[in-house]
Structures are given as C-alpha cells and as structure tokens.
Amino acid sequence: MTRMMARPAKLFVLCAILLSQAACDEFKVPIPKDIKPAVDTYRLSSLAISDLSKPDIRRPLLQLSREACNRDAMGRLAAEIDALGYRRESADALVAFVDRCGRADGFLGAAIEDLIAASDYQGAVAIANRLLANDATEPQYYFDRGRAYEGAQQDEAALADYMQVLALSPDRASVTSNLFIRIADLHAKAGRYCDAVSAIRMWVSADPERADNAQAKGIIARYASHASCPTSYASGQESFARKGSNTIQVKARINGVEGTFIVDTGASYVVMSQAFAQRARIDTAQARHIRLQTANGPREGLLAQADSVKLGQVEASAVPVSVDPAGKAPFGQGIDGLLGQSFLSRFEVSFAPTRWSIRQHS
C-alpha cells in the first residue's frame, strides 16, 4: 500500500517540477529600469539578462542611459559584448550610436569587423561605403570593403578594392603581406597565375630584405607550377647607365608610341598623361575611376590597359595603366608618365650607383 501511494506522489512532484519549468520559460525577467533606456535605444534586448547584468556591461549601460551619446561608454560596451560573441548586436549598437550622435569613423570601422564576423557581407559593404563617403582616400576603408566583397564571393570587386589600397599607399614596404596574398589568391582563383606571381613579387620588391623570404618563394613556386607564363607576358633583358640624379628617365614605348617616363618603383601602375594616352590609343571608354596617392598628394586616375609596354629589349603585354585626366604636363615638362609596378613587378629589377638593369624572371 505504501509503495502504491508513493508512486502517485512521485508523479505529482515530477509534474509540479515540469509545470514550474514551463512557467519559468513563459516568464521573462524584465530589463532593469536603470539600464532600459540604453538597451532600448541601442537595440540590445536580445542579450541575456545575465549578460546585461555583468558589471562591465551594466556600467556603460548606466552611463548611456543617462547620456545616450557618451562615446567612451559605447566603446567599452561594444568591446564587452563583442567578447561575449554578440557581434551582430555590437555592430547594430555602434551604427545606431553614429546615426544618433554624429560621425565616429572608428565605431563604423569596428562595426564592419563585427558584420564580417557575422557573415553579413552586404551590410559590411554598406558601412564601408559610408566611411568612403567621409574620406575617399583612406586605404583601410577600401581594404575592409574588399574583405567584405571577398566574403560575398564578389571577387573582381574585392580585387579592385585591394588594388585601390596599393594605389593609395606610396610606401609599399609598409603594406602588410596579407594584402598582396589576397590579391594573388584572387588572381589565381580566376586562373591568372602569372598575375598572382607578379603580386607576390611586388611585395618582395618593396623591401630588399624580403628577397629571401621563404613564404614568398613558396607561394611563387606554387602558383608558377599551375601554368607557364606566355613569352608575351614578360620577356627580354636590358641594362642602362644612370646619371647623377636619383631620378631615372627612360624612353619607353606604349602600344608602339614612344614617350619619356620616370622609373618609379613606388608607383603601383604605369601612369601617363591624358595627352600621351590619346597618342598611344589607350581605350578609356570602359576605364574605372581610381584614386592615386602621389608625392604631390592624391590624384584621380582612369584605370585602363595597354596592349604592350616596351623598354629597349624588355617587353610586357596587357599591362594595367592609369591615365591622369589632369592638365597637359601633370608629371613635369617633357615627362609623359611614370613606369610603375604594373610593369616593373613582372621583371627582376636591380639598381647600382652607375647602372640599373631589368630582366625577365628566371
């Protein structure tokens, strides 16, 4: 009899526990009133109450509830909820802060990182576009947008942004190898292995100490094993005398038209005046607008392609070039342009006090 009575009692207790749990599931602990203004303003209601109550999160929420545009508090709050994995919520809060309180480019940059982490690539692109509207000459914004495009598998858009980073970075030695590797990987993904190799060589050439870099050599060997570059891609060798000046002027032929160019290892592209581009029949009808960082400040350019660039016996085909749409002599009197890395990186280039040489990579 005792056993028979014990079984219903156990069932009653079990049912009571289950009913209690169900009731708890339906009952939502309210957000504390003292932090609710900030939680509502910055759309943080999806965070667990236990997380909102953590001292390092509650403290900035209290400050933001009193002063909605407290930048220090928002910076601390975003960092804390980031650390807990609330990347989407952090991005939304940062963007909402900027919308409400005014320009804060650092917050938008952090929001891009959060959105990329949350795989919201189009959202990240949209925020990067806002930053570029504020400052179209900041390389970091193009790099961030390129990463978002790459995540969205919009490879050509990503590549265009990565190349824009180089165009805005006159000191390539300070540019991270990560950028060049991304450029190379995108070229390789499209089957352009010669261009992939050139991208890594451009990074190597930026600093003589990188000549024996094992990682760079390994990447070059890997890409080179996929396809042999055609002779027209880069061929020949030449050696030239140097005058006393640090500036090296050469006679180069673009699409068969001769011009005077300055050898500029810091220029990302072969750059030419609009007048010379017209003589050389460079088609700019479908050219993409880019921005270049030069010794004289930022400039606009039209990114096109030359069928051939020839320097003595050295020649390359299908070379990206930038056309300067400015005045008649943007590079100085008698100078038609700059011979930059879109040509030079295809070759081994070395400089000595009295001579300099250029030759096809072995």
Give each language-model segment a name:
Residues 12-21:
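Bacterial N-terminal signal peptides
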Residues 24-362:
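Pepsin/retropepsin-fold aspartyl endopeptidases
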Residues 2-12:
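Bacterial N-terminal signal peptides that target proteins for export
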